[in-house]
């Protein structure tokens, strides 16, 4: 749940914290805790806080794309060390969730489940491009950005000697600076708003994506299991 706007509203509220807590029907300590991090509050409590600030809450569903889902699957199949994941709480929750979804899942089933909820094209801030998708062109733009990056999807599968399911499987470029990299690619690419029409997906990098990766001939590539998860996520 994205509670950024509510957090900002609570911080700017002209109502005294004690009065805000009274109006919302919560203790002052609870109001203080939720002001810092409302993400774990019950929806009813969040609505009361919002109403006390003159706001209301609207819920909308979006395609899931949680990097910790992929990280959890990688930990479970031995492709990633748990201590290399920043947020242990999120990791633990996803490990438990995947086990609950399929208690006796084989590694491939785990990667498929993780792919459904961590797909690059569904990540907030992902950019869809049509143009050259050869690794050298994408790597040159990523290197020029001087930000962390790694290739996944088709080139990573190719490096592993794995044939993608679809010959049209897009290349995934994970980067800390999607907008900058896109700007460096516009001479050979054009932007599209349709993920299924793109052959290059430039997606915001999460730190777990880099763990276990390798540099092959100047190309930064994700780990084998991350490559499989990403490829399944984009349909390849």
Q: Which role fits each region the language model picked out?
A:
Residues 6, 20-21, 31-34:
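Conserved hydrophobic/aromatic packing and binding residues within compact polymer-binding modules
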Residues 10, 21, 50:
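The alpha-helix within a helix-turn-helix
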Residues 51-136:
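Charged, helix-prone or intrinsically disordered regulatory segments positioned adjacent to compact structured domains
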Residues 37-51, 62:
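Short, basic-rich loop-to-helix N-cap that marks the start of a DNA-contacting helix
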Residues 101-206:
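Short gly/ser-rich loop at a beta-strand->alpha-helix junction or flexible surface loop bordering the NTP-binding
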Residues 25-41:
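Recognition helix of helix-turn-helix/homeodomain-like DNA-binding domains
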């Amino acid at each position: 749940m994205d509670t950024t706007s509510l957090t900002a509203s609570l911080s700017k509220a002209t109502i005294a914290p004690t009065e805000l807590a009274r109006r919302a029907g919560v203790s002052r300590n609870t109001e203080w805790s939720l002001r810092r991090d409302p993400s774990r509050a019950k929806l009813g409590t969040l609505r009361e806080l919002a109403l006390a600030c003159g706001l209301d809450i609207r819920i909308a569903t979006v395609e899931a794309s949680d990097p910790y889902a992929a990280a959890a699957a990688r930990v479970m199949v031995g492709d990633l060390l748990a201590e290399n994941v920043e947020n242990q709480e999120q990791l633990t929750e996803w490990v438990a969730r995947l086990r609950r979804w399929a208690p006796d899942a084989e590694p491939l089933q785990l990667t498929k489940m993780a792919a459904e909820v961590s797909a690059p094209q569904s990540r907030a801030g992902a950019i869809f491009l049509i143009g050259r998708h050869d690794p050298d062109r994408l790597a040159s733009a990523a290197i020029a950005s001087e930000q962390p990056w790694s290739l996944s999807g088709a080139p990573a599968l190719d490096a592993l000697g794995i044939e993608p399911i679809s010959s049209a499987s897009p290349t995934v470029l994970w980067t800390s600076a999607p907008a900058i990299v896109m700007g460096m690619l516009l001479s050979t690419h054009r932007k599209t708003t349709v993920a299924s029409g793109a052959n290059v997906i430039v997606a915001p990098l999460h730190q777990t994506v880099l763990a276990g990766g390798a540099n092959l001939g100047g190309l930064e590539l994700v780990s084998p299991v991350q490559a499989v998860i990403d490829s399944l996520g984009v349909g390849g």
